[in-house]
Curated annotation (Swiss-Prot):
Protein name according to UniProt: Ribose 1,5-bisphosphate phosphokinase PhnN
Class of this enzyme: transferase
EC number: 2.7.4.23
Keyword Hydrolase: no
Organism (species): Yersinia pestis
Listed transmembrane segments: none
Gene Ontology MF: a single term: ribose 1,5-bisphosphate phosphokinase activity
Described function: Catalyzes the phosphorylation of ribose 1,5-bisphosphate to 5-phospho-D-ribosyl alpha-1-diphosphate (PRPP).
Keywords (A to Z) from UniProt: ATP-binding, Nucleotide-binding, Transferase
Amino acid sequence: MARLIYLMGPSGAGKDCLLSALRNATPQNRVVAHRYITRPADAGAENHVALSKQEFIQRAEQGLFALHWQAHQHCYAIGIEINLWLQHGLDVLVNGSRAYLPEAQRRYRHQLLPLCLTVSPAILAQRLRQRGRENSEQIDARLQRAQHYQQQLPSHCLQLCNDGELQHTLNQLQQLLTLDTPLSDPVEDKPCN
């Protein structure tokens, strides 16, 4: 059965870099979906489809999104094209929201494989400071939010630590994706310490 691999993690965990590396190394039976976001195309590292707020609302009303949510003053969506890809037997990776995971699970049930990219608090704080988008108060809030969500992950959520080199994390991800883990059974958690 094709899987919807729902990648989550805090800002600064390296999701965009990991998905970009995976796009370049992806086998033919796996695709990485682009997100539709109400922010400029050149904002951040993510390769996304930029929409105005009005375009986003119109597409949502027309049923063109499989999943959509709001976070950090922006709207995010995954297009309905993922349903066609899944029907064709392709595994689909998406950059999802931790807060939206219950809705994604409701919609995709046993097809959904939750995967959380984790980073130790010290490294996450360092990365957030280096990118320079937030002040220290906002960074503290992001760190608290990351810790809260880490504690709330479901037991069947795979965890992948991204404290080291990107290539190492990519290799680990590719190994995880080749496993035939039943999607409804719990798997061993491997958080960062």
